Amino acid sequence: MLDEWILVSPHRAKRPWQGQNEKVAPDNRPEHDSTCYLCSGNVRSNGIKNEEYTDCYVFENDFSALLQEEVLFENHSQPLFQQKPERGINKVVCFSPKHNLTLPEMELADIEKVVKTWAAQYIELGSHDYINYVQIFENKGSAMGCSNPHPHGQIWAQSSLPTQVEKTQKNLLSYYIKNNNSLLKDYVEEELKLQKRIVIENKHFVVLVPFWATWPYETMIISKRHFGNIIAMNKEETSAFAAILKGITVKYDNLFETSFPYSSGIHQAPTDRVLHPEWHFHMHFYPPLLRSATVKKFMVGYEMLGEAQRDISPEQSAEILRNLSDIHYKANS
């Protein structure tokens, strides 16, 4: 996908650990927190009051990284210093009014509302003539830098293709031109034959640990049918996507019986008004935890200076996740 190699070293997993241990967040959050900027009816830090929302709630980020007005700057004559203006829109998507929930604990019907909200935002944001890519993502847990525990994600829509997306598109397009088929469709069909890295499967989607996975329990959700973006899903596929989202996040929580941190995001076709037959809808999950609820994988040293390295094989990770219960551990307590 990115033309990058991964060093796999499963023999390192048992080395002694005297390094940093993550703090496990207390599991006693109220359903509504009067001090939370994202809870229904509360006033945010900029003085704007949230609506008394009952399911998904979307608003423009009060601290947007991207501005809708183009920022002008002086161009450098020296080609070693290259820069360009960027425009965009940042939004926050509250998944639920309930402060004490996360995606795996939500009802399936409510997760489906989140998926439909993502689709509506893809259409709305992509309709702007200067928006060429819509990045939907979630940072869950303080270990992934999440600034608020209320269940929420973000959408960053911008005029340029982000670097990771641009690299992915380049490789998807190269494969499509050479093989007249989707790279990810061919890939998921091969994985389904082998079954070694499959975690969950339903009629329309597959969750697997990718052959090239970097993070210990990294997974991808890949559609079985070839389509390029979230709005191409039919009603049945939307329900199936919500179900498999719940399925993998429940397994994540069950792994160490904790609210499992991760960064996740959808990769899909740009909104640049060009046909993109090379794009195949998929979603990435990058969780940092390695050995327990308190020990995470650090991408430092060799990983920063050389290439990514993992301490457990993709096949081992897939087997561990696959064998976990589909019922959330809290439901059994």
Where are the predicted features?
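Active-site microenvironments that recognize anionic phosphate/pyrophosphate groups
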Residues: 1-150, 156-236, 249-250, 261-262, ...
